Swiss-Prot record:
PPR repeats lie at residues 209-243, 244-279, 280-314, 315-349, 350-384, 385-419, 420-454, 455-489, 490-524, 525-559, 560-594, 595-629, 630-664, 665-699, 700-734, 735-769, 770-800. Its main location: plastid. This is Pentatricopeptide repeat-containing protein At2g18940, chloroplastic. InterPro entries: Pentatricopeptide_rpt, PPR_P_subfamily, TPR-like_helical_dom_sf, TPR_rpt. Residues 23-37 have a biased composition (Low complexity). PROSITE patterns: PPR. Keywords: Chloroplast, Plastid, Repeat, Transit peptide. Residues 1-42 are annotated as: Disordered. GO terms for molecular function: mRNA binding. The keyword Chloroplast applies. NCBIfam families: PPR.
Amino acid sequence: MDGALFPHKPPYPIQSKRPPPSQSSNQSIKFSSATLHLPPPSPPSFPLDSLLHHLVHLSSPPPRHSNSAAARFPSLEVSTDSSSSKPILGIEIENERNGSLKLLCKKEVVLVNSIVEQPLTGLSRFFDSVKSELLRTDLVSLVKGLDDSGHWERAVFLFEWLVLSSNSGALKLDHQVIEIFVRILGRESQYSVAAKLLDKIPLQEYLLDVRAYTTILHAYSRTGKYEKAIDLFERMKEMGPSPTLVTYNVILDVFGKMGRSWRKILGVLDEMRSKGLKFDEFTCSTVLSACAREGLLREAKEFFAELKSCGYEPGTVTYNALLQVFGKAGVYTEALSVLKEMEENSCPADSVTYNELVAAYVRAGFSKEAAGVIEMMTKKGVMPNAITYTTVIDAYGKAGKEDEALKLFYSMKEAGCVPNTCTYNAVLSLLGKKSRSNEMIKMLCDMKSNGCSPNRATWNTMLALCGNKGMDKFVNRVFREMKSCGFEPDRDTFNTLISAYGRCGSEVDASKMYGEMTRAGFNACVTTYNALLNALARKGDWRSGENVISDMKSKGFKPTETSYSLMLQCYAKGGNYLGIERIENRIKEGQIFPSWMLLRTLLLANFKCRALAGSERAFTLFKKHGYKPDMVIFNSMLSIFTRNNMYDQAEGILESIREDGLSPDLVTYNSLMDMYVRRGECWKAEEILKTLEKSQLKPDLVSYNTVIKGFCRRGLMQEAVRMLSEMTERGIRPCIFTYNTFVSGYTAMGMFAEIEDVIECMAKNDCRPNELTFKMVVDGYCRAGKYSEAMDFVSKIKTFDPCFDDQSIQRLALRVRENLES
């Protein structure tokens, strides 16, 4: 192995030995805090105050109006600038262009003008003041008049007032008014407004037309009110009017979004066939989208094959939906075959087609290939859009390739593709993970200048970034600021909070937030369960994790690849290797789909448990499915081979890194140094360290600890102290592992006086010795037969650390007595 392996990176040393310097040259080097150039403790890694200040400043809270519909119905966030952006009507019947306005009588024209002249905040009071006049007016014509004149928001506020009056018994709503209202809000995509107001209307008392019912079904689907949609659909079939093809497509969408409803979807399809309704592209794409959400690859392929066998010719929309199935699962080979079939059938690919291909590559770990799709699209005359770029940027961020992500972001802007809020959120997330707060602030400003104000998802991103141990107070603060800026939590927010508290190690807060979520009217979904699993994975509580999985299944939810990945993490953290094996066997038996993420987690779980055989099996399984390992996988395999002295296999991993065109990172070189240290070639390890110091990959604490460990194992304590001095000169503070390595080295050499120097140095530098520190010293005395010295050392532990645990001292004293008696 030589420098040719990675020609553009720090070369590996070719020197096999380096004679130690003469002892006389090292006499002056002594372990002492006076010889160490310790830097001050690092500041907090995430300066939240400054970042939060900018986010609050840039966030524009949604307007609140005490007398508007939004005040009584928080979901009624319709446009509030209509009074300034729309001209006030001075309606003259004879020259009005809108046909419906010509039908208004003079009294109704005056009323329309009066409504238009009122500020939105004063509409409720105005309606109350002209209540008797409104009740004598043709309300259908009045609502149409407001809508046709461009003031649909005022028509909605009028309808809201009518609903309140109807509930108080002052009037009976006309079914035509409801139909017009539903059409207006459907046209304007105001589904949450529609769903909120419709909850106040006893729909069972009205018979509406099929178009209105279909729009209401769509509103329920968009707002997650699936049970209401299903009840309404069943009532339509029982009472009329008969559902149309569009209605059936909407109810298919309802079942697809609701989840765990594949049999019901098949039942709806059979019902459509029995009524002679021919499937269109929306039917097919909706069914395939349902498969994508649930990971139903086999069902999707069977449904698509059946369609074609019946003579159906898929169009771009249907093919895109099929691509989404494979894209979500990361099965890029199937996605490529779909793209090939489209070309063979002369079916034009659009930006959505390529976006799904990008998603497939990303899910399979091929971020470079995903970026290559952008060039492919351009050559074929299809311009990549914000979704395309955002998907790849997010993939780079998750792979730890922040610089590539930022480079692509700026290339996106240069190409004339305007980033959207999702793009900025992805960039903010990857910058936050690396604590690059100054760049985050610049990105927030850039976001605002491009007309993308921070939204709820931006705040959710900020909450997620606070999910580190000990940062639960920061989570609380960000959540308070989020609400003060007018962003009420949605289900995604609650899921993010549960996950963030879990990562902070605050399982109590995570459970509390789950309770708040249900009280707020949000039902748990797969993401919620995964957030709970994430909290349990941090603690290794695999028993509770298994209960969560059982609860999911009992409620009809199908655990996803994320669910099983988190269970693997639970087992790994909890040391339950048999649990890892059970999931591995289910994957091999075909019960769980072997996605890129799941197999990657399987390998990492085995690595965490130091299970060599399990890691090798997972690595073989990973490559068997055609997935591309990332540097985390390669580094894990390199490390476990090194730990087990399997140097030929370790060199094979290094060769695979080169063949895959990947760049070794600092973790790779740290593992390589560890390999040399384990072989006793500490000088080679130092050569790599010296080369790293001159490269862009600057050595870290692990790098120096590894070389120090090598020298200590060889008894070259003066060289180890020299490395420690160089480390601190570079601004890297030693940790407990560093000090314990010196204790171990001095103990092996019988240099007990120096050990006390190390412990005193630890105390001076705010690094408390742990039980292992003292245990190594006690064992060293015992091995040397110095039992009385060992007991003397135990008796003065409190002088080194007055807060050291009494039970630990008793255990150490017992250890000395047991050694003496053996």
